[in-house]
Amino acid sequence: MFTDVVELTVSSGKGGQGCVSFRREKFVVNGGPNGGDGGKGGDIWFKCDNNTHTLSHFQKKMHIKADNGAPGESSNMSGKSGVKKVIIVPPGTQIIDMDSEEVLFDMLIDGQEELFISGGRGGLGNTHFKSSTNQRPTYAQPGEKGETRRIKLDLKLIADVGLVGFPNVGKSTLISTVSNARPEIANYEFTTLTPKLGQVNIGDFESFIMADIPGIIGGAHEGKGLGIEFLRHIERTQILLFMVDLASYRDLKEQIETLKAEVGAFSDKLGSSKYAIALTRADAVAQDEINDLVNSFMEIVGVKATSNSNLNFDKNLPYFIQDSADETLGYDREIPYFVMPISSATNKNIDPLKHALFNLVQTNRIYSK
């Protein structure tokens, strides 16, 4: 089961009680105090781990506690400190205070560690309270209480490219074709019920991450369908690939306008993201119809077919791609970076799609450094 939001109560450990003890040695009458200090309570830490992909290992309303410090001992021996509790979370997890709603930590990088709550200090043993007027103190400090906080863990997946489309538009087929992801694929709507990440390799040494989320329908930002729960998983993505089905019963203009409207209504940031458009299922449209269909769609989004790319597009199909993915060299973010018909079933234009998306990703990485 994919879990992306959990509420937890977390408590650091209580400090150990200081010890009341006196020297007991042969020929020593009424020995002085030698009570040791209590151990420090265990801390609460968060750690980001690439090997964790969901929050499903947390039980609902779970209470996570660090160990308490051990009491001090005689002979001025301090108690053992409580073992710290390290909470493992996947990359993309935000730690949010339930009372103030403040984002405390944004866990993004594998190996990132953050101290959340320190354990209570151990109490002082009676050795510390010896004075000229009190040679045998019978008092030792109690340990400090640990701290308890209510938090929410909110997982937002981290990807370079987010796929956005109506249900059954071919998102899962595409991500399984270009990456190592293996989502469920079937010929019915809402096959994808949880977000999926896939690594798209470009040659031997380059790659980018693609995210597939459940299909969007009109009204998704208001809670209709499954998309509202998962749109937030592409909030961190810099690039959106809108997928429009050439063979759908839905009008092409209706598809792209609805998708863009839903994304923009959900998040201003998403609405202003760089984007491209893939026209899916090109293999399902007759050859004598597809050129007119693609050209008419390009007119809808305000672009015209080009032929100046070196990405080895299928020469039998019209396509559009901007001259550069770099805004300093003429990239226009008001229009799609590219519009291309594709077929995952026949691999038509799949390689150009991968490389064109990588051009956008690479430019973003350069300017985000």
Swiss-Prot record:
Its main location: cytoplasm. Residues 126-146 are annotated as: Disordered. The keyword Transit peptide does not apply. Residues 159-362 form the OBG-type G domain. Residues 1-158 form the Obg domain. GTP binds at residues 165-172, 190-194, 212-215, 280-283, 343-345. Keywords: Cytoplasm, GTP-binding, Hydrolase, Magnesium, Metal-binding, Nucleotide-binding. One of its GO terms (molecular function) is magnesium ion binding. Mg(2+) binds at S172, T192. Belongs to the TRAFAC class OBG-HflX-like GTPase superfamily. OBG GTPase family. Monomer. An essential GTPase which binds GTP, GDP and possibly (p)ppGpp with moderate affinity, with high nucleotide exchange rates and a fairly low GTP hydrolysis rate. Plays a role in control of the cell cycle, stress response, ribosome biogenesis and in those bacteria that undergo differentiation, in morphogenesis control. This is GTPase Obg.
